[in-house]
């Protein structure tokens, strides 16, 4: 009924999963049945959310909450692709959105944290910058995933967010939240076409490139690569850092070009992806 009554486009998703599992864009009414089934299969409780599609750049925000204070630590630009699914293929930190928009997003994030009653600990938010202003996609009582709180933020600032969050959990005041430097850190996923991985080459050479901080592989030769419909099942990641945004992105692209993932025995999904 919600799909019939609400204006298109819409987004349907499970209310109790993670990693964009079961999240899908509905652009036409006839797409609703399949999207409903996919979301239902990904839901632990069977409960779903149908909401407006929010068009615009997406931000990822982290915050620490302690001593009655909300300290927003970092804001990154998320790159979402693979419509009608919502797959994060990477992020760049810090965001290069106008400061005025970042201020509005920060205000909304802090208001949402208070509304949820998160008065101690950590919080992460995904916020869209729409033509009508910032809108909340998700708020959670934890630090961000996707390598942001554990890799890109520490690499860009020198601040260990995980340590700070643990200190708060122990009832202590974080001791080291002041930025030591102001770099740009970039994370991008390695996403081959679907099929069976025959070989992975060039990883050691990629790691030797100046500015490459991490090359992380979650798959190896013999594993299968499926078509990505969520943030689960990626083959690997490259994380880089530099003094400028352009340089950090350039280094990341070079590292990923250095790595060769050879695919054989293509699955039936391969040709859909290529088309």
Which residues fall in each region the model found?
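A conserved helix-loop-beta module that forms one wall/lid of the active-site cleft
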Residues: 1-22
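Generic preference for hydrophobic
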Residues: 12, 50, 72-75, 136, ...
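Short, well-ordered beta-strand elements within core beta-sheets of diverse protein domains
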Residues: 24, 52, 154, 235-242
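Active-site "cap" helix and flanking loop/linker of ATP-utilizing ligase/carboxylase catalytic domains
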Residues: 103-125, 131, 140-198
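A short, glycine/Asx- and small/polar-enriched loop/turn
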Residues: 6, 129-135, 229-234
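Peripheral (often C-terminal) accessory segments that flank ATP-dependent C-N-forming ligase machineries
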Residues: 164-275
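Short, flexible turn/loop "capping" segments at secondary-structure junctions
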Residues: 12-17, 85-86, 145, 228-233
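Internal nucleotide-binding/catalytic subdomain
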Residues: 23-134, 143
């Amino acid at each position: 009924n919600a799909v019939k009554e609400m204006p298109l486009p819409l987004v349907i998703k499970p209310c109790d999963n993670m990693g964009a599992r079961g999240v899908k864009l509905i652009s036409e009414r006839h797409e609703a049945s399949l999207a409903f089934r996919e979301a239902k299969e990904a839901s632990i409780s069977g409960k779903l959310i149908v909401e407006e599609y929010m068009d615009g750049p997406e931000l990822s925000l982290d915050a620490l909450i302690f001593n009655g204070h909300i300290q927003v630590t970092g804001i990154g630009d998320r790159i979402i692709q693979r419509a009608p699914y919502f797959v994060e293929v990477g992020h760049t930190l810090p965001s290069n959105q106008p400061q005025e928009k970042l201020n509005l997003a920060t205000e909304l994030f802090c208001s949402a944290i208070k509304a949820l009653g998160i008065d101690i600990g950590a919080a992460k938010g995904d916020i869209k910058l729409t033509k009508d202003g910032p809108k909340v996609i998700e708020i959670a009582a934890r630090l961000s995933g996707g390598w942001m709180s554990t890799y890109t933020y520490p690499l860009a600032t020198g601040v260990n967010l995980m340590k700070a969050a643990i200190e708060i959990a122990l009832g202590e005041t974080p001791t080291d939240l002041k930025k030591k430097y102001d770099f740009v850190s970039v994370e991008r996923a390695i996403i081959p076409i679907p099929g069976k991985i025959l070989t992975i080459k060039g990883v050691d050479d990629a790691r030797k490139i100046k500015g490459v901080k991490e090359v992380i592989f979650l798959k190896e030769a013999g594993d299968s690569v499926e078509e990505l419909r969520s943030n689960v099942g990626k083959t690997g990641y490259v994380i880089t850092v530099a003094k400028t945004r352009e340089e950090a992105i350039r280094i990341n692209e070079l590292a990923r070009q250095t790595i060769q993932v050879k695919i054989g025995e293509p699955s039936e999904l391969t040709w859909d992806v290529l088309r």
